A protein has these predicted regions:
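A structural signal for multi-pass alpha-helical bundles of membrane permease subunits
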Residues: 23-285, 289-291, 295, 300
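Short, Lys/Arg-rich, polar N-terminal cytosolic tail immediately upstream
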Residues: 1-21
Length: 300
């Protein structure tokens, strides 16, 4: 007697015709076509154009001149570019781990609070994200002011400093001030994501581990941390991208000064392209001499 499982296994799905498969494939590509056109026109083509332009001396006042790899040699010989590269690396290395660690700590502390309290904390930390960068910059510029800023006032009040410090006009402090602002505007989204991820962890597993004698750290490290790893990876990616793209704070606060101490790759590209009009900006730069003549060091 043939079993029911054998009968079921012997039944094969009807094979679809090649015409139907071809029709579905064409329909799929037609749905994909608008996005593909946008991707080719606004991503792939500009990338190819940038690579081609990097082999020319391209300015607005004359025709492009083919120079081969001279632009690359000039770029890496420019100490201002090397400084911008170093500053960008410092911003990424400092801001990414600090943002992720602080966001995870805050989220772990507020996730078990009453719902209205958790929502309040999320709103407070997310407020700088939805606030315009210009408004945020104006507030921080007032706080950093070397005459009446709140940092100088509090520093002298508690005895940390003896005299006012020009926070944005001193090479020793300017980049650190930029990183501090970037941190306050970057933790909002990770906190919201971490609170959501921690709230989705199966509490029955956590309770079972606690009954077996697991400590809070062991519950976090063995149960919660693996569960929120996908969220952590996403946060690391977006935080790294945001750190590399730090531009508005630099432009509005220091313009790369003082003495190029807050230059980043994004601001360097902007200044080279839209101030000096050298459109091989993504891979080339003006000479250090030309750049120094055309730009005075900025200070707060």
């Amino acid at each position: 007697m043939i079993s029911l499982a054998a009968k079921t296994a012997s039944i094969k799905e009807p094979k679809r015709s090649s015409a139907l498969v071809r029709q579905e494939t064409i329909a799929s590509y037609l749905f994909l076509l608008p996005s593909l056109i946008f991707f080719l026109g606004f991503v792939i083509y500009p990338m190819i154009l940038c690579v081609v332009t990097s082999f020319f001396d391209s300015t607005m006042n004359r025709a492009d001149i083919f120079v081969g790899f001279a632009n690359y040699a000039e770029l890496f010989a420019d100490p201002i570019f090397i400084g911008a590269l170093r500053n960008t690396f410092i911003i990424v290395v400092v801001s990414v781990p600090v943002t992720c660690a602080f966001s995870l700590w805050v989220s772990s502390a507020i996730v078990d609070l009453p719902e209205w309290t958790t929502s309040l904390f999320r709103c407070v930390f997310y407020l700088p994200v939805v606030t315009g960068s210009v408004a945020v910059t104006v507030v921080w510029k007032w706080m950093y002011n070397n005459y009446y800023g709140i940092f100088n006032y509090l520093g002298k009040a508690v005895g940390l400093i003896d005299k006012n410090i020009n926070w944005l006009g001193d090479e020793k402090y300017a980049l650190g001030c930029i990183i501090l602002i970037l941190l306050t505007t970057s933790v909002g989204q990770p906190i919201v994501l971490y609170v959501s991820a921690l709230g989705n962890v199966d509490q029955s597993i956590v309770e079972a581990a606690e009954v077996d004698g697991a400590t809070d750290f062991q519950c976090f490290w063995r149960i919660k941390w693996p569960a929120i790893m996908p969220t952590t990876l996403y946060i690391l990616v977006i935080t790294t991208i945001n750190s590399f793209q730090c531009f508005a704070l630099i432009q509005l606060l220091t313009s790369g000064g003082p003495n190029h101490s807050t230059d980043t790759i994004m601001y360097y590209i902007y200044y080279t392209a839209f101030k000096l009009y050298r459109y091989c900006l993504l891979y080339t730069s003006p000479s250090p001499r030309d750049r120094q003549k055309s730009r005075m060091p900025s200070s707060a």
